[in-house]
């Protein structure tokens, strides 16, 4: 990881793209600290916390991320790789994480699950068949501003691939 980071940093000296150093170390604080310091020495645009979502418990993950974010500068983007459930996302945002990569909003959209403040609901449920309101009242996403819940349900049932884009947009916005 350190060799890759040095090589990548050298290649991207004059690039307009952002480059992130990846902090590794598993569950071991001393390895994470060493990795973070190596990445900080290279002065990246942001820092990714890698090696998560591979078997640690949620509390272990929070401890690892909290420890690592305390080392990383708060004025640079901090990105967690591979974590995607809503509870973890909210917990990690509270710890100072700015970015994530996950498929969860899209995956659940394909199954008709719609995120709202209470969690999510299943759009396939027949009770949404005639609902003329947006998916979430007050939501300012493109889908909610332009389409009713009943129309989104119609697309999901009759033209599912057409619905996924709109439902994913909504889920990401939430």
Q: Across the structure, where does each feature detected by a protein language model lie?
A:
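Generic detector of bulky aromatic hydrophobic side chains
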Residues: 4-7, 18, 31, 61, ...
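Generic structural signal for well-ordered, non-membrane alpha-helical segments
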Residues: 1, 32, 61, 145, ...
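Glycine-rich phosphate/ribose-binding loops and adjacent secondary-structure elements
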Residues: 14-135, 139
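C-terminal extensions of enzymes
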Residues: 138-174
């Amino acid at each position: 990881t350190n060799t890759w980071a040095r090589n990548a940093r050298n290649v991207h000296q004059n690039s307009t793209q952002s480059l992130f150093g990846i902090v590794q170390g598993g569950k071991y604080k001393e390895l994470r600290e060493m990795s973070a310091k190596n990445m900080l020495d290279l002065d990246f645009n942001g820092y990714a916390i890698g090696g998560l979502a591979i078997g640690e418990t949620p509390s272990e993950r929070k401890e690892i991320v909290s420890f690592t974010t305390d080392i990383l500068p708060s004025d640079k983007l901090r990105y967690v790789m591979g974590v995607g459930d809503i509870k973890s996302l909210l917990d990690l945002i509270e710890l100072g994480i700015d970015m994530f990569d996950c498929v969860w909003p899209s995956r659940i959209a394909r199954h008709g699950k719609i995120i709202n403040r209470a969690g999510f609901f299943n759009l396939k449920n027949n009770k949404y068949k005639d609902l003329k309101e947006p998916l979430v009242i007050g939501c300012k996403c493109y889908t909610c501003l332009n389409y009713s819940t009943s129309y989104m349900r119609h697309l999901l049932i009759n033209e599912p691939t057409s619905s996924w884009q709109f439902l994913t947009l909504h889920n990401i916005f939430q």
